Swiss-Prot record:
NCBIfam families: alr, PRK00053.2-2. This is Alanine racemase. Belongs to the alanine racemase family. Keywords: Isomerase, Pyridoxal phosphate. The gene is alr. One of its GO terms (biological process) is peptidoglycan biosynthetic process. Gene3D superfamilies: Alanine racemase, Lyase, Ornithine Decarboxylase, Chain A, domain 1. GO terms for cellular component: cytosol. Its cofactor is pyridoxal 5'-phosphate.
Length: 328
């Protein structure tokens, strides 16, 4: 069966490197949404906890429940209020019109729209939002924003930072001891993080976004069959690849049903061991030169992202959660 190997030492190295950058593990919010970006949330949770991480963020209540035994604080980022929220968790308030729909006395972090215009409350509407939060009997314990262009060299990043500083000044008039967080993975290595803020880290904890970090995930497939492909014979759907000489080929147990982008046989898609995929990828398998019982499909998602003209996030989060993940 196909297999995802998670490098424990690389993950721990990355978290230590990040914690050193921001000052401590206590100021770190590890984002574990979407199965920890495809890496396996439940597999990584005890590693993060043992290093001193006590705060994580996830997408949904279901994700929070999966790892609640490991962390003191779990922020749910994409929640639609239903009135029966769990007091064990913290909920993002993304739209002030939804405030009355939350269960009373539930802990919330208020999302501020500082310029991304996706979720959150505009700074000019913040005082009105505070009134609604107080009248709804919600427990405001934090406030945050998300930078839209922290990885791009334009001025919008600094405009958003300034807008968040304005929001902090306003909310501090009404509340004390709030937890603030604005810097994401892209912003982490772009400048100093304000001393009164935590830092949310997503993909950087898995080795992307800074050259000093180490890749954590590698994807492997196992051989289903092998044969001699004779000169002039083709392999796979449509016969896209034809052997120019006799060659030993093998078929491996990984395909687009496992969350991989479908290779259509055009161009050279280089695998983790340097071999290239031969012919079109099938639903549950692909072929290449025989590389033994096990083959590394990729250990750097950037290579596949570049080939398919997408981003490394998409390569990783699409990996089927049913693929076994193991620590190595």
């Amino acid at each position: 069966m196909s297999l995802i190997k998670i490098d424990q030492k690389a993950y721990e190295y990355n978290l230590r490197h990040i914690a050193k950058k921001i000052g401590s593990f206590q100021r770190l919010i590890c984002v574990f949404k979407d199965n920890a970006y495809g890496h396996g949330a439940k597999l990584l949770a005890p590693l993060a906890k043992n290093l001193g991480v006590s705060f994580v963020a996830v997408k949904s209540e279901e994700e929070a429940q999966e790892i609640e035994e490991f962390f003191e604080n779990i922020l749910i980022l994409s929640h639609r209020p239903h009135g029966n929220e769990n007091s064990r968790f913290i909920y993002a308030l993304n739209d002030i019109s939804q405030a009355k729909k939350y269960k009373q006395d539930i802990k919330i972090h208020l999302k501020i729209d500082t310029g991304m215009h996706r979720n959150g409350i505009c700074v000019e509407n913040l005082e009105h939002a505070i009134d609604l939060i107080q009248s709804s009997d919600l427990k405001l314990t934090g406030m945050f924003t998300h930078f839209a262009s922290a990885d791009e060299m334009d001025g919008s990043f600094f405009v958003q930072k300034e807008n968040f500083q304005k929001a902090k000044k306003i909310v501090k008039k009404y509340f004390s001891n709030l937890l603030f967080h604005s810097h994401n993975s892209a912003a982490l290595f772009r400048g100093k993080i304000p001393e009164d803020e935590y830092c949310r880290v997503g993909l950087v904890q898995f080795g992307y976004g800074d050259s000093n970090l180490k890749r954590v995930l590698s994807l492997y497939a196992h051989r289903l069959s092998q044969r001699i492909l004779q000169k002039g014979q083709s392999i796979g759907y449509g016969g896209i690849f034809t052997a120019a000489k006799d060659m030993e080929v093998a078929t491996y147990d990984l395909g687009y049903a496992d969350g991989l982008f479908r290779y259509n046989g055009k161009g050279e898609l280089v695998l983790g061991n340097g071999k290239v995929m031969l012919g079109k990828m099938s639903m549950d398998s692909f072929s290449c030169e025989n590389s033994g019982e096990e083959i590394c499909v990729f250990k750097d998602a950037d290579i596949w992202a570049d080939f398919f003209h997408t981003i490394n996030y998409e390569i990783l989060v699409k990996l089927n959660p049913n693929i076994q993940r193991v620590l190595v």
